[in-house]
Protein backbone atom coordinates (compact mmCIF):
# COMPACT_ATOMS: atom_id res chain seq x y z
CA UNK A 1 0.00 0.00 0.00
CA UNK A 2 1.30 3.43 -0.94
CA UNK A 3 0.69 6.31 1.49
CA UNK A 4 0.33 9.66 -0.27
CA UNK A 5 0.04 13.11 1.28
CA UNK A 6 -0.19 15.61 -1.58
CA UNK A 7 -2.72 16.14 -4.35
CA UNK A 8 -0.15 16.18 -7.13
CA UNK A 9 1.51 12.99 -5.90
CA UNK A 10 -1.86 11.24 -5.82
CA UNK A 11 -2.74 12.30 -9.35
CA UNK A 12 0.61 11.04 -10.60
CA UNK A 13 0.16 7.72 -8.78
CA UNK A 14 -3.30 7.15 -10.28
CA UNK A 15 -2.35 8.14 -13.83
CA UNK A 16 -1.18 4.64 -14.93
CA UNK A 17 -4.42 3.06 -13.69
CA UNK A 18 -6.45 5.59 -15.65
CA UNK A 19 -4.40 5.02 -18.78
CA UNK A 20 -5.01 1.28 -18.47
CA UNK A 21 -8.77 1.80 -18.05
CA UNK A 22 -8.83 0.39 -14.53
CA UNK A 23 -11.78 1.16 -12.28
CA UNK A 24 -11.00 3.14 -9.13
CA UNK A 25 -13.06 2.60 -5.98
CA UNK A 26 -12.87 5.38 -3.39
CA UNK A 27 -13.69 5.36 0.34
CA UNK A 28 -13.53 8.85 1.92
CA UNK A 29 -13.12 8.78 5.72
CA UNK A 30 -12.02 10.93 8.64
CA UNK A 31 -9.95 8.09 10.04
CA UNK A 32 -9.93 6.20 13.33
CA UNK A 33 -11.28 3.31 11.33
CA UNK A 34 -13.70 0.67 12.56
CA UNK A 35 -15.57 -2.34 11.18
CA UNK A 36 -17.95 -0.13 9.24
CA UNK A 37 -15.13 1.53 7.33
CA UNK A 38 -13.55 -1.82 6.60
CA UNK A 39 -16.82 -3.07 5.11
CA UNK A 40 -16.79 -0.08 2.75
CA UNK A 41 -13.23 -1.03 1.81
CA UNK A 42 -14.24 -4.64 1.22
CA UNK A 43 -17.02 -3.59 -1.16
CA UNK A 44 -14.69 -1.23 -2.99
CA UNK A 45 -12.08 -3.95 -3.45
CA UNK A 46 -14.62 -6.46 -4.75
CA UNK A 47 -16.11 -4.06 -7.29
CA UNK A 48 -13.02 -2.21 -8.58
CA UNK A 49 -9.48 -2.75 -9.84
CA UNK A 50 -7.88 -0.11 -7.61
CA UNK A 51 -8.96 0.81 -4.07
CA UNK A 52 -8.16 4.18 -2.54
CA UNK A 53 -9.03 5.38 0.97
CA UNK A 54 -8.70 8.96 2.13
CA UNK A 55 -8.22 10.02 5.75
CA UNK A 56 -8.87 13.69 6.36
CA UNK A 57 -10.47 15.32 9.39
CA UNK A 58 -12.25 18.10 7.56
CA UNK A 59 -12.46 21.32 9.59
CA UNK A 60 -15.19 22.74 7.35
CA UNK A 61 -17.77 20.31 8.73
CA UNK A 62 -17.19 21.06 12.42
CA UNK A 63 -18.97 23.84 14.27
CA UNK A 64 -17.27 26.26 16.65
CA UNK A 65 -18.15 24.24 19.76
CA UNK A 66 -17.76 20.76 18.28
CA UNK A 67 -15.05 18.13 18.64
CA UNK A 68 -12.57 19.01 15.87
CA UNK A 69 -9.67 19.31 18.29
CA UNK A 70 -10.33 16.04 20.06
CA UNK A 71 -11.59 13.95 17.15
CA UNK A 72 -9.65 10.65 17.42
CA UNK A 73 -6.64 10.41 15.14
CA UNK A 74 -4.15 7.55 14.74
CA UNK A 75 -2.74 7.38 11.22
CA UNK A 76 -0.29 4.58 12.03
CA UNK A 77 -3.09 2.39 13.38
CA UNK A 78 -5.34 3.17 10.42
CA UNK A 79 -2.57 2.52 7.90
CA UNK A 80 -2.02 -0.90 9.43
CA UNK A 81 -5.70 -1.78 9.12
CA UNK A 82 -5.81 -0.63 5.50
CA UNK A 83 -2.61 -2.51 4.65
CA UNK A 84 -4.15 -5.69 6.06
CA UNK A 85 -7.31 -4.98 4.03
CA UNK A 86 -5.16 -4.84 0.87
CA UNK A 87 -5.92 -1.23 0.00
CA UNK A 88 -3.78 0.10 -2.85
CA UNK A 89 -3.51 3.76 -1.87
CA UNK A 90 -4.03 5.77 1.32
CA UNK A 91 -4.43 9.49 0.73
CA UNK A 92 -3.76 11.37 3.98
CA UNK A 93 -3.46 15.09 3.24
CA UNK A 94 -2.96 17.82 5.82
CA UNK A 95 -5.33 20.76 6.18
CA UNK A 96 -2.80 22.94 4.35
CA UNK A 97 -2.68 20.39 1.51
CA UNK A 98 -6.46 20.49 1.09
CA UNK A 99 -6.98 24.17 1.89
CA UNK A 100 -3.76 26.06 1.11
CA UNK A 101 -5.72 29.31 1.39
CA UNK A 102 -9.12 30.15 2.85
CA UNK A 103 -11.93 28.58 0.82
CA UNK A 104 -14.16 31.06 -0.98
CA UNK A 105 -16.09 28.37 -2.85
CA UNK A 106 -18.63 26.34 -0.90
CA UNK A 107 -20.90 23.55 -2.10
CA UNK A 108 -24.22 23.62 -0.28
CA UNK A 109 -27.32 21.48 -0.71
CA UNK A 110 -30.23 23.27 0.93
CA UNK A 111 -32.82 22.44 2.04
CA UNK A 112 -31.53 18.85 2.39
CA UNK A 113 -28.60 20.00 4.50
CA UNK A 114 -30.48 22.43 6.74
CA UNK A 115 -32.80 19.95 8.42
CA UNK A 116 -32.51 16.98 10.79
CA UNK A 117 -28.81 16.73 11.75
CA UNK A 118 -28.17 19.94 9.82
CA UNK A 119 -30.60 21.80 12.06
CA UNK A 120 -28.57 20.78 15.11
CA UNK A 121 -25.26 21.40 13.30
CA UNK A 122 -25.59 24.51 11.09
CA UNK A 123 -23.15 24.48 8.18
CA UNK A 124 -22.14 20.86 8.73
CA UNK A 125 -23.41 19.48 5.43
CA UNK A 126 -22.05 22.42 3.43
CA UNK A 127 -18.65 21.41 4.82
CA UNK A 128 -19.28 17.77 3.92
CA UNK A 129 -20.45 18.53 0.38
CA UNK A 130 -17.52 20.90 -0.20
CA UNK A 131 -14.83 18.45 0.87
CA UNK A 132 -16.43 15.47 -0.89
CA UNK A 133 -16.75 17.38 -4.16
CA UNK A 134 -13.10 18.44 -3.86
CA UNK A 135 -12.01 14.86 -3.16
CA UNK A 136 -14.01 13.66 -6.18
CA UNK A 137 -12.20 16.23 -8.32
CA UNK A 138 -8.83 15.11 -6.95
CA UNK A 139 -9.40 11.35 -7.15
CA UNK A 140 -11.75 11.04 -10.12
CA UNK A 141 -13.18 7.73 -8.86
CA UNK A 142 -15.49 5.44 -10.78
CA UNK A 143 -17.35 4.56 -7.58
CA UNK A 144 -17.43 6.00 -4.05
CA UNK A 145 -18.64 4.18 -0.95
CA UNK A 146 -20.59 5.64 1.97
CA UNK A 147 -22.20 4.02 4.99
CA UNK A 148 -25.96 4.16 5.41
CA UNK A 149 -25.49 5.06 9.08
CA UNK A 150 -24.98 8.61 7.83
CA UNK A 151 -28.17 8.39 5.80
CA UNK A 152 -28.77 12.11 5.41
CA UNK A 153 -25.19 12.52 4.20
CA UNK A 154 -25.75 9.74 1.65
CA UNK A 155 -28.90 11.43 0.31
CA UNK A 156 -27.06 14.76 0.08
CA UNK A 157 -24.04 13.29 -1.72
CA UNK A 158 -26.32 11.53 -4.21
CA UNK A 159 -28.18 14.77 -4.90
CA UNK A 160 -24.94 16.73 -5.26
CA UNK A 161 -23.59 14.20 -7.75
CA UNK A 162 -26.84 14.28 -9.73
CA UNK A 163 -27.10 18.07 -9.73
CA UNK A 164 -23.44 18.65 -10.65
CA UNK A 165 -23.23 15.77 -13.17
CA UNK A 166 -20.19 14.33 -11.39
CA UNK A 167 -19.36 11.02 -13.13
CA UNK A 168 -19.14 8.79 -10.08
CA UNK A 169 -21.33 5.92 -8.92
CA UNK A 170 -22.42 6.40 -5.31
CA UNK A 171 -22.75 3.15 -3.38
CA UNK A 172 -24.57 3.02 -0.04
CA UNK A 173 -23.43 0.22 2.26
CA UNK A 174 -25.55 -1.17 5.09
CA UNK A 175 -24.75 0.00 8.62
CA UNK A 176 -22.30 -2.23 10.48
CA UNK A 177 -23.12 -2.72 14.16
CA UNK A 178 -21.49 -3.94 17.33
CA UNK A 179 -22.72 -7.20 18.84
CA UNK A 180 -25.30 -5.36 20.98
CA UNK A 181 -26.66 -3.37 18.02
CA UNK A 182 -24.91 -0.02 18.51
CA UNK A 183 -23.85 1.41 15.15
CA UNK A 184 -20.09 1.41 14.68
CA UNK A 185 -18.73 4.95 14.92
CA UNK A 186 -15.35 6.55 15.51
CA UNK A 187 -16.99 8.68 18.21
CA UNK A 188 -17.96 5.62 20.27
CA UNK A 189 -14.46 5.84 21.76
CA UNK A 190 -15.60 8.96 23.65
CA UNK A 191 -18.13 6.98 25.71
CA UNK A 192 -17.36 5.99 29.28
CA UNK A 193 -18.28 2.39 30.21
CA UNK A 194 -21.51 3.65 31.80
CA UNK A 195 -22.36 5.77 28.77
CA UNK A 196 -21.54 2.89 26.45
CA UNK A 197 -24.09 0.73 28.25
CA UNK A 198 -26.64 3.55 28.05
CA UNK A 199 -26.02 4.08 24.32
CA UNK A 200 -27.79 0.84 23.47
CA UNK A 201 -31.03 2.82 23.89
CA UNK A 202 -30.41 4.26 20.40
CA UNK A 203 -30.72 1.03 18.35
CA UNK A 204 -33.40 -0.14 20.78
CA UNK A 205 -35.41 2.97 19.92
CA UNK A 206 -35.22 2.01 16.25
CA UNK A 207 -36.50 -1.45 17.13
CA UNK A 208 -39.35 0.18 19.05
CA UNK A 209 -40.17 2.46 16.11
CA UNK A 210 -40.31 -0.56 13.82
CA UNK A 211 -42.59 -2.40 16.25
CA UNK A 212 -44.95 0.56 16.64
CA UNK A 213 -45.14 1.19 12.90
CA UNK A 214 -45.87 -2.44 12.15
CA UNK A 215 -48.56 -2.45 14.83
CA UNK A 216 -50.41 0.36 13.06
CA UNK A 217 -49.07 3.66 14.41
CA UNK A 218 -48.95 5.65 11.17
CA UNK A 219 -49.19 9.23 12.42
CA UNK A 220 -45.67 10.72 12.15
CA UNK A 221 -46.10 13.09 15.10
CA UNK A 222 -47.35 10.29 17.33
CA UNK A 223 -44.50 8.03 16.24
CA UNK A 224 -41.90 10.73 16.90
CA UNK A 225 -43.39 11.40 20.34
CA UNK A 226 -43.38 7.70 21.20
CA UNK A 227 -39.73 7.36 20.19
CA UNK A 228 -38.80 10.42 22.26
CA UNK A 229 -40.57 8.98 25.29
CA UNK A 230 -38.81 5.65 24.80
CA UNK A 231 -35.35 7.24 24.64
CA UNK A 232 -36.09 9.46 27.63
CA UNK A 233 -36.40 6.35 29.78
CA UNK A 234 -32.59 6.31 29.73
CA UNK A 235 -31.45 9.23 31.93
CA UNK A 236 -28.05 9.53 30.24
CA UNK A 237 -29.59 9.89 26.77
CA UNK A 238 -30.93 13.18 25.42
CA UNK A 239 -32.80 12.96 22.08
CA UNK A 240 -31.82 16.02 20.03
CA UNK A 241 -33.34 15.05 16.68
CA UNK A 242 -36.07 12.51 15.97
CA UNK A 243 -37.23 12.65 12.38
CA UNK A 244 -39.69 10.61 10.34
CA UNK A 245 -39.03 11.30 6.67
CA UNK A 246 -39.30 10.07 3.11
CA UNK A 247 -36.14 7.99 2.64
CA UNK A 248 -35.38 9.37 -0.82
CA UNK A 249 -36.20 13.07 -0.49
CA UNK A 250 -36.03 13.58 3.31
CA UNK A 251 -39.38 15.37 3.03
CA UNK A 252 -41.75 15.40 5.98
CA UNK A 253 -44.66 13.01 5.58
CA UNK A 254 -48.17 14.16 6.56
CA UNK A 255 -49.31 10.55 6.76
CA UNK A 256 -47.32 7.34 6.63
CA UNK A 257 -49.90 4.87 5.27
CA UNK A 258 -47.61 1.85 5.50
CA UNK A 259 -45.02 3.24 3.08
CA UNK A 260 -41.27 2.82 3.69
CA UNK A 261 -40.10 5.58 6.04
CA UNK A 262 -36.78 6.77 7.39
CA UNK A 263 -36.48 6.99 11.16
CA UNK A 264 -33.46 9.17 11.93
CA UNK A 265 -32.12 9.67 15.46
CA UNK A 266 -29.55 12.13 16.77
CA UNK A 267 -29.04 11.38 20.46
CA UNK A 268 -26.59 12.88 22.93
CA UNK A 269 -25.13 10.49 25.50
CA UNK A 270 -22.93 12.46 27.85
CA UNK A 271 -21.02 14.84 25.59
CA UNK A 272 -21.16 12.46 22.62
CA UNK A 273 -23.67 12.77 19.80
CA UNK A 274 -24.72 9.41 18.39
CA UNK A 275 -26.35 9.15 14.99
CA UNK A 276 -28.42 6.21 13.82
CA UNK A 277 -31.32 5.48 11.50
CA UNK A 278 -33.35 2.77 9.91
CA UNK A 279 -35.69 2.51 6.97
CA UNK A 280 -38.81 0.67 8.08
CA UNK A 281 -41.93 -0.30 6.19
CA UNK A 282 -43.16 -2.89 3.75
CA UNK A 283 -40.71 -2.46 0.85
CA UNK A 284 -37.08 -1.60 0.30
CA UNK A 285 -36.66 2.08 -0.69
CA UNK A 286 -34.78 3.15 -3.79
CA UNK A 287 -32.15 4.99 -1.77
CA UNK A 288 -30.64 1.73 -0.55
CA UNK A 289 -29.93 0.70 -4.11
CA UNK A 290 -26.78 1.66 -6.00
CA UNK A 291 -27.34 4.49 -8.43
CA UNK A 292 -25.09 5.93 -11.11
CA UNK A 293 -24.61 9.64 -11.54
Swiss-Prot record:
CC per GO annotation: cytosol
Keywords of the record: ATP-binding, Cytoplasm, Ligase, Nucleotide-binding, Pantothenate biosynthesis
Residue sites binding (R)-pantoate per the record: 61, 153
GO molecular function, one term: pantoate-beta-alanine ligase activity
Signal sequence residues: none
Positions of the catalytic residues: 37
InterPro entries for the chain: Cyt_trans-like, Pantoate_ligase, Pantoate_ligase_C, Rossmann-like_a/b/a_fold
Residue positions binding beta-alanine: 61
Record has Membrane as a keyword: no
EC number(s) recorded for this UniProt protein: 6.3.2.1
Gene Ontology terms describing biological process: pantothenate biosynthetic process
Quaternary organization: Homodimer.
Function: Catalyzes the condensation of pantoate with beta-alanine in an ATP-dependent reaction via a pantoyl-adenylate intermediate.
Protein name stated in the entry: Pantothenate synthetase
Gene: panC
